[in-house]
Regions:
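Glycine-rich phosphate-binding active-site loops on the catalytic face of alpha/beta enzymes
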Residues: 87-101, 171-180, 229-248
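Glycine-rich tight-turn/loop motif centered on a GG-T
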Residues: 85-87, 107-120, 181-195, 235-237
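Alpha-helix-loop-beta-strand connector modules within alpha/beta enzyme cores
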Residues: 3, 48-82, 104-112, 138-141, ...
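Conserved anion-binding
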Residues: 75, 87-166, 256, 260-266
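Conserved N-terminal beta1-alpha1 strand-loop-helix module at the mouth
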Residues: 1-72, 104, 146, 164-168
């Protein structure tokens, strides 16, 4: 997996967060052209079964299925890998020691101690790579991204050590929680937040890892790309739905009030 657009390698990949759930909504996001979608098990009301449906629906259309897990314990991590997630984003990481445990739980031998089973991630035991378990383990360790979030003071303090760990594929900076931890919630223009973001970017570049962040608008996304982030997840599916509905309703009301002519509605 690379972090470029699946159709236009010259531009960075574009992704979003999914809170709606369900296969239909995920297919719509994939068909809209997103390169990856982050199914949010931390804040979304999803079961393992519903997460598997979401992952499958995204992958059918060539969209990478990222999952933000609910916690960093072994079952929470391993189940999302077993259902076939392409990458895991782990929230609220506190230290390099916690990250070492995350790598241990999510990477196969010899890098870690991830458990193996005939689950969806290996075609329920039919994957051709299983002819050599060593080769399958190596491929999974390389292709399945493990991305801790930097959104606590502890993670920020340890960021260089975290990024340096073998098995950590990148860092996702959580701007809202990190700005709160820095004492200025949602203030992304403070020197302290900017310097923290630059520290994350620099650490990732120094170790050849991916730097990611969330943006609420296209202007914010552009600024983050220009700052040096490799991947920017923009908005949420719920926001897109609400915004589009509000736009259509507003346009329709204006047309009715002005002339009653609805021929120009998209």
């Amino acid at each position: 997996m690379n972090y470029c657009d699946r159709n236009q390698p010259e531009r960075p990949a574009v992704g979003t967060f999914a809170h709606l759930g369900g296969g239909t909504a995920m297919e719509c996001l994939a068909l809209a052209g997103f390169d990856y979608v982050i199914a949010d098990a931390e804040h979304g009301p999803f079961s393992v079964e519903s997460m598997q449906e979401m992952v499958r629906a995204l992958q059918i259309h060539g969209c990478k299925a990222f999952v933000r897990v609910s916690a960093s314990d072994r079952p929470s991590l391993m189940r999302m890998l077993d259902i076939g997630a392409d990458a895991l984003i782990i929230p609220n990481v506190q230290s390099v020691e916690e990250t070492q445990k995350i790598v241990e739980y999510t990477k196969f031998f010899p890098m870690g101690r991830r458990g193996f089973a005939f689950s969806r991630c290996c075609g329920y035991g039919q994957d051709r790579d299983l002819q050599s378990l060593d080769e399958y383990f190596a491929k999974a360790n390389s292709e399945k991204w493990i991305i801790p979030q930097c959104e606590t003071l502890g993670a920020l303090e340890d960021i260089e050590k975290i990024v340096a760990l073998e098995g950590v594929d990148g860092i996702f900076l959580g701007p809202y929680d990190l700005s709160s931890a820095l004492g200025a919630p949602a203030r992304f223009d403070t020197d302290r937040f900017r310097k923290s973001a630059e520290r994350v970017i620099r650490a990732c570049k120094d170790h050849g890892k991916i730097s990611m962040i969330f943006a609420a608008s296209t202007a914010q996304a552009k600024a983050y790309w220009e700052q040096g982030f490799d991947m920017v997840a923009i908005g949420t599916d719920t926001d897109f739905l609400i915004s589009r509905c509000q736009k259509v309703i507003s346009e329709l009301v204006k047309l009715i009030e002005s002339s009653g002519d609805m021929s120009s509605i998209d």
